[in-house]
Amino acid sequence: MEITHLPEDNLFKTVVDGYTAYVTYIIRDGKLDIRHTIVPPEIGGRGIAAQLVKATYDYALKHHLQPIATCSYAVVWLQR
């Protein structure tokens, strides 16, 4: 699965079977806050959300930002 980062839109996205899934974030005060994780039900249950959150998390660490989450899915993912 190819994940694309669109920094001008503050999101990571992927297209699977013609459906777009994405994570949105904001950067403020040295923190990257994962705000929303959206995966259409047609492509749910395939681990897509986890891969998108991981890509966002990895980006935060690479850029010396503290990853935090407002998104309930990402909160649980970050606790693992």
What annotation goes with each model-predicted range?
Residues 19-22, 32:
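Glycine-rich phosphate/pyrophosphate-binding loop shared by adenosine-nucleotide-utilizing enzymes
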Residues 26-35, 66-68:
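A conserved beta-turn-beta hairpin within the catalytic core of GNAT-like acetyltransferases
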Residues 37-44:
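A short, internal acetyl-CoA/4′-phosphopantetheine-binding micro-motif in the GNAT/acyltransferase core
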Residues 10-20:
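Conserved beta-hairpin
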Residues 6-8, 28:
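Structural motif
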Residues 58-72:
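Conserved GNAT acetyl-CoA-binding A-motif
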Residues 45-58:
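Conserved acetyl-CoA-binding loop-helix of GNAT-fold acetyltransferases
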Residues 1-5:
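Conserved N-terminal entry element of GNAT/NAT acetyltransferase domains
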